């Protein structure tokens, strides 16, 4: 597969004005960080389990934050209840109690659709505010960006545009391209940016560090992944064993003064991935410890 040729056309405009840092009133407290990074899981890692179990497994793996997704079963005790932005206040209280039990902070929600249907999009942001989230993660309808920006400002909740892999049979799918994502947010409120999915960059033939440089200062969160090969067929492996170059990714995020969360979305070994996830978090912990020992 030919590797994608990086284009810096849109990013160049940002370089002229220096690094743009994403700022928000909702900072992630240091107690939820491993070194300088808030790292935990995207609950989709544990999609064969309930959201309650995903919280517990995140804690078992050493994570301190979690990103939820819509549609996951809430708990194994109530198979009819789902986690989404229409869940009842009663179930939301149960979710918060489970988070408190394992001292896990919820930080994001997605990937969730956002459109010009204001009632539905507003429900997403209202849910995010109720749960105390920093951001929602979406692949929004581009024509809805004005409405989304209005809601971001009103709720002080960020919106991070996610990228799935390039779709050769669907040229209209553009979120895989960091230049396109940047074009949607570059002239808007800084609380609009990217959820940089490192694994999907690799599957699209995009070198992750190059993508992050294009998105300079607009990375709100990241789905951090190391893949076994640089192709659409790549699958997750523990950090340091693949081709994503996780150390370079972490260094680039540090250079950009990234203050968001790293969501481990481990889409392999689905039924027993906690040891692999723990190894990934341990890699970041070791990287941070080694960095602090540098002269």
Where are the language model's segments positioned?
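Bacterial N-terminal signal peptides that target proteins for export
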Residues: 1-10
């Amino acid at each position: 597969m030919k590797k994608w040729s990086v284009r810096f056309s849109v990013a160049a405009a940002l370089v002229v004005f220096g690094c743009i840092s994403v700022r928000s009133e909702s900072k992630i407290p240091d107690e939820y960080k491993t070194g300088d990074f808030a790292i935990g899981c995207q609950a989709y890692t544990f999609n064969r389990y309930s959201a309650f179990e995903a919280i517990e497994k995140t804690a078992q793996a050493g994570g301190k934050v979690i990103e939820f997704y819509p549609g996951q079963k809430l708990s194994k005790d109530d198979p009819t209840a789902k986690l989404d932005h229409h869940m009842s206040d009663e179930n939301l209280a149960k979710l918060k109690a489970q988070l408190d039990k394992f001292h896990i902070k919820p930080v994001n929600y997605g990937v969730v659709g956002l459109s010009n249907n204001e009632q539905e999009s507003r429900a997403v942001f209202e849910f995010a505010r109720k749960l105390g989230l920093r951001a929602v993660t979406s692949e929004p309808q581009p024509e809805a960006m004005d409405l989304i920006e209005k809601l971001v400002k009103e709720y002080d909740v960020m919106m991070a545009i996610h990228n799935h892999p390039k779709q050769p049979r669907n040229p209209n799918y553009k979120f895989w391209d960091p230049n396109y994502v940047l074009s949607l947010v570059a002239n808007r409120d800084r609380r609009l940016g990217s959820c940089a999915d490192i694994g999907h960059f690799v599957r699209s033939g995009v070198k992750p560090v190059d993508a992050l440089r294009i998105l300079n200062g607009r990375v709100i969160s990241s789905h951090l992944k190391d893949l076994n090969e640089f192709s659409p067929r790549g699958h997750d492996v523990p950090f340091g064993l693949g081709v994503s170059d996780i150390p370079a990714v972490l260094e680039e995020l540090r250079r950009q003064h990234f203050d968001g969360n790293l969501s481990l979305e481990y889409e392999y070994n689905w039924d027993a991935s906690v040891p692999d996830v723990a190894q990934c978090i341990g890699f970041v912990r070791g990287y941070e410890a080694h960095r602090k020992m540098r002269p």
